[in-house]
Amino acid sequence: MYQDQINAYFDDPARRQQLVEMISRLVRIRSVREEAQPGMPFGPGPAAALAEGLKLAEELGFAAKNYDNYVGAVDFNDQETQLHILCHLDVVGEGTGWTVTEPYEPVEVDGMLYGRGTDDDKGPVAAVLLAMQAVKDLGVPLKKNVRLLMGTDEESGSEDIAYYYSKEPYAPCTFSPDGEFPVINLEKGSYKPVFTKTWAAESATPRVKELHGGFRINVLPPEAQCVVAGLSAQAARPYCDKAAAETGVAYELTERGDDLHILCKGKGAHASTPEEGVNAITGLIHLLCALPLAKVGSTAALHALNALFPHGDSAGKALGIAQADQMSGPLTLAFSLLELNDTGLSGQFDSRVPVCANEDNCKAVAEAAFAKFGFAAEGGMQAPHYTPADTPLVTTLLKCYEQYSGRKGECLAIGGGTYVHDIPGGVAFGCAMPGFNGNMHGPDEHTCIADQLTAAKIFAQAIIDLCG
């Protein structure tokens, strides 16, 4: 029921314009987590985005509530809540390499809307709000309530949603449009240890004095830079040319006195799909291990890292933890953070682990590999999340997807964690269509406007079927 009305509602050109304007209003706000301020647990940016999201909901006539700038809740009616839809308004940092537009200046090109958050997850917020508006405008009677939850800390640990559920109960049904269609019912676990090594300060040259790589644990680093004491650009350039051909990264050399500054540029990607990017940290280490450096502590540590994380190894083979199972696929690994100075280093990788992974075949193996080179590693594992495919929620969502997409519905397993990872019975549902790559977390992030409109149709039908 209601398919013809829903199609007609969203096929109106005015609806498309409304969607673009709503997403753009949210994207213009830089909602990256920063230091907490009074009443703003994740800083002013996420709080400002939440205020705008709640304003959009109120403009559509919905009751909205701000949970202390952690989460915003938007209710369809005052009945018992049957469905929670979880979206988030925070974004990862802008990074570098944008070419179509600036990160917070949304622009439409060839049916795609570009800007940080268009795909993850401000576009889906707008699609859900429009779906709720459609159900209301079409006069569909709902016996139960649907509540949209707009979070502000999904990218940095989901403290927001934990705060909300410490005060409010779970709903019988929960989905999050923070993934892709059809339905994601299995999310891999994760292992993200911090590893360290120290050594005595030394003055021999050439040596690496400092190195900085990456800006967020769940982003494959697009850039890394270092300072090499006692080496000229002329001496380093042949090594750079060879390493660039081997790795696919670019190196920029700048001399400042006796120091050589090296900037390595790769390609950013989400840490759960490292094969879609080019890791600047491992690309820089690859070069440094080829240079004629002095035999000092930093040189030995870099050679150890090169052995443990060779450039292009996104499966954890060298570390000894590569594994896979039929249900959830292979382990993936992104070496995403590294800081090094004259007396030590600290790094962290983000691995998404299959159901078959455990502390014995993953954590213990990695710690032993680190120990072999004199590193210490600390950090536990997060369990996978799984909701059976035959639950009423999943079967209903798949039916709605098939109804409006014309494609076969099926369940998927992913490496990325979504808001529902710790919510019993929850699944990720949209907004990306199969095969679409919006370069989430990378430069020129974008969403397909037509796909977002289709997603809004699907969500409207799902709200009706689950709450009607």
Q: What is the predicted function of each stretch?
A:
Residues 1-87, 92-95, 346-348, 449-451:
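N-terminal helical capping/dimerization or prosegment-like subdomains
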Residues 9, 18, 22-29, 52-60, ...:
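Generic non-transmembrane alpha-helical segments
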Residues 53, 125-135, 164, 228, ...:
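Buried hydrophobic packing segments
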Residues 72-74, 226, 258-265, 346-349, ...:
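A generic structural motif
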Residues 82-150, 156, 443-454:
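Active-site metal-coordination/substrate-binding segment of hydrolases
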Residues 121-200, 233, 237, 241, ...:
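Acidic/histidine-rich catalytic neighborhood of metal-dependent amide-processing enzymes
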Residues 185-188, 192-212, 217-267, 271-332, ...:
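Acidic-enriched catalytic cores of C-N bond-cleaving enzymes acting on peptides and small amides
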Residues 268, 272-342, 348, 352-364, ...:
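An extended, acidic, His-containing surface patch that forms the Zn2+-binding/catalytic region
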